[in-house]
Curated annotation (Swiss-Prot):
Native organism: Mycoplasma genitalium (strain ATCC 33530 / DSM 19775 / NCTC 10195 / G37)
Protein name: Probable transcriptional regulatory protein MG332
Keywords in alphabetical order: Cytoplasm, DNA-binding, Transcription, Transcription regulation
Protein's GO biological process: regulation of DNA-templated transcription
Signal peptide positions (record): none
Length: 239
């Protein structure tokens, strides 16, 4: 299935990382530290959180300050994953990190009422998603076949390579993500954006009214300090 919109949305948002996004990244780092300590290499949760923070423009100095500050912070941060069915059966997954679970659930119920959606049973939505690494790199005078050969010869578990005039979009199994990034850097590729994310296996179409409802839901979640990110399987549309 076409994948360009997956990374394109991320690239557009990266142009200007908001203060709220920075706060959410800091909270994700804090949660990861509380889970597994401050060593980036031995704590897989922290490694992913740091990688995302770097991709969104945070400096390593800022990240290190967040890590050390989180080590001393005694605030309990709880992690939540809510699965939702929205208009026309669109599947939605909401990931939250909060020090107040009741506040998060209350807010989410309010958003759901306006969406005309409902909470789903565990794994009833997740089953339609798979975790992938997405890496967006400048073409660097490479041909697509040459890039594929480079990745496969180094045992990268590749899913797909797509491209436009300037960039390649590489989709791969998440267990090859960090290996692939190092390989690309060694071969002088400039990484524009990258992330491990959930990608839908099947997508659904929404009509204009349903698109509006989902857009409002996504905007509300984006403004909520307790919600880290949201994924869904609706086909993209023009705002």
């Amino acid at each position: 299935m076409p994948r360009k919109h997956l990374i394109a949305n991320q690239t557009n948002k990266k142009q200007q990382t908001s203060a709220k996004q920075l706060q959410k990244l800091a909270k994700r780092i804090a949660s990861a530290v509380k889970k597994g300590g401050t060593n980036i290499q031995s704590n897989p949760h922290l490694k992913v959180a740091v990688d995302l923070a770097l991709a969104k423009g945070l400096s390593m100095d800022s990240i290190k300050r967040n890590i050390h500050g989180s080590e001393k912070d005694t605030t309990k941060i709880s992690e939540f994953c809510y699965e939702i069915f929205g208009p026309n059966g669109v599947g939605i997954i909401v990931f939250g990190l909060t020090d107040n679970p009741n506040r998060l659930l209350s807010s989410l119920n309010g958003y759901l009422a306006k969406l005309k959606g409902q909470l789903a049973k565990p794994n009833s939505v997740k089953i339609n998603f798979q975790e992938e690494g997405i890496i967006f790199v400048n073409k660097n005078n490479y041909l697509k076949d040459d890039l594929i050969e480079l990745l496969i010869l180094d045992n990268i578990n590749l899913i797909d390579v797509d491209y436009d005039e300037e960039c390649f979009e590489i989709s791969l199994h998440s267990n090859s993500y960090f290996h692939a990034k190092e390989l690309l850097k060694k071969n002088n590729f400039s990484i524009v954006d990258s992330e491990i994310k959930l990608v839908p296996l099947l997508t659904v179409d929404l009509d204009r009214n349903q698109q509006t409802l989902l857009s409002r839901f996504l905007n509300a979640c984006e403004e909520d300090d307790d919600i880290q990110f949201v994924v869904h399987n609706a086909n993209p549309w023009e705002e």
